[in-house]
Regions:
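Second-shell loop/turn segments in exported
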Residues: 7-16, 30-36, 112-121, 134-138, ...
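Sec-exported extracytoplasmic/periplasmic mature domains
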Residues: 15, 27-31, 50-57, 115, ...
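Structural recognition of the beta-strand scaffold that forms the well-ordered cores
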Residues: 36-39, 108-109, 179-183
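Flexible, polar/acidic helix-loop-strand segments at domain edges
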Residues: 47-143, 147
Length: 266
């Protein structure tokens, strides 16, 4: 939820109220104080990757099939000719190798929501793409102004171009840390659909997950959940039946689970 709307999927906030609603949703549900944002469309991401010369991504044959399907839409959005990743189907769906792909295909890979892992795997793919982009930027930071010139028409942000350029030039100082899908402890599937009438991911519990998130992001700092977080957490627990007694008995993708490499500022 945010200050404008009732409970719904978190990602519906942007569609309903744009950046202001999105920031409100994040701040209200996670006890943050975010004021700035950057959003990009498919074309911006694909164009940025092309300026970097494409990416080398390890993909299974099954992921190649899905990426090729998504690329029909992405290549059209980018305004480039459709291309497909070649693969040998005789090697089976699980066969994996590193493939050099264009911006459109890398964006298509990041969109895959099918196969094992569900939404957590999809967001993992997105972090893989961002990780690889940062690595290439560190190798050639002079590409940053070219990327900005290429993509700014497809970017919505509260920051000025000069502010983005200044932030981007610090890319060479970034190190690669670890991150996890969020919420850390969660539930989804048939039981949630039966309880809520919607196919959604729910935190178990919201209050527990927000505590864990603040400890992960700001280790050692004292934090107590706001009244809003506690209220929303109790509401979700009552509606779903997944309360604090279920912590530790549901899917765990937080600290202690397998992590992904992501960006961490020095």
């Amino acid at each position: 939820t945010d200050e404008y709307y009732e409970f719904d999927k978190a990602n519906s906030a942007y569609n309903r109220g744009g950046p202001e609603s999105m920031l409100s949703m994040l701040n209200t549900n996670l006890d943050f104080a975010l004021t700035d944002y950057v959003t990009v469309n498919f074309k911006a991401l694909a164009d940025a990757i092309d300026v970097l010369g494409g990416l080398d991504i390890e993909m299974t044959n099954a992921e190649c099939v899905h990426a090729n399907n998504y690329n029909r839409e992405v290549s059209e959005a980018q305004g480039v000719e459709y291309e497909a990743i070649p693969y040998d189907e005789d090697l089976g769906d699980d066969y994996s190798e590193v493939r050099h792909v264009s911006g459109a295909l890398a964006t298509s890979y990041a969109r895959i929501r099918y196969g094992g892992g569900d939404d957590a795997k999809r967001t993992s793919r997105q972090r893989i793409v961002i990780n690889l982009m940062v690595q290439k930027l560190k190798q050639n930071p002079t590409k940053i102004p070219e990327i900005l010139d290429k993509v700014m028409g497809n970017v919505s942000t509260s920051l000025t171009k000069n502010e983005i350029l200044e932030l981007g030039m610090h890319a060479v100082t970034y190190t690669m840390g670890t991150s996890y899908a969020y919420p850390f402890q969660l539930c989804y599937g048939e039981n949630v659909v039966n309880a809520l009438g919607e196919d959604v991911v729910i935190p178990v519990t919201l209050e527990f997950n927000v505590r864990e998130l603040h400890e992960y992001l700001y280790p050692g700092l004292s934090y107590e959940p706001s009244a809003a977080v506690t209220e929303y957490s109790d509401y979700i627990a009552r509606k779903s039946g997944y309360d604090e007694d279920m912590i530790g008995y549901v899917l765990n993708q937080g600290p202690g689970a397998e992590a992904d490499s992501v960006i961490a500022g020095d």
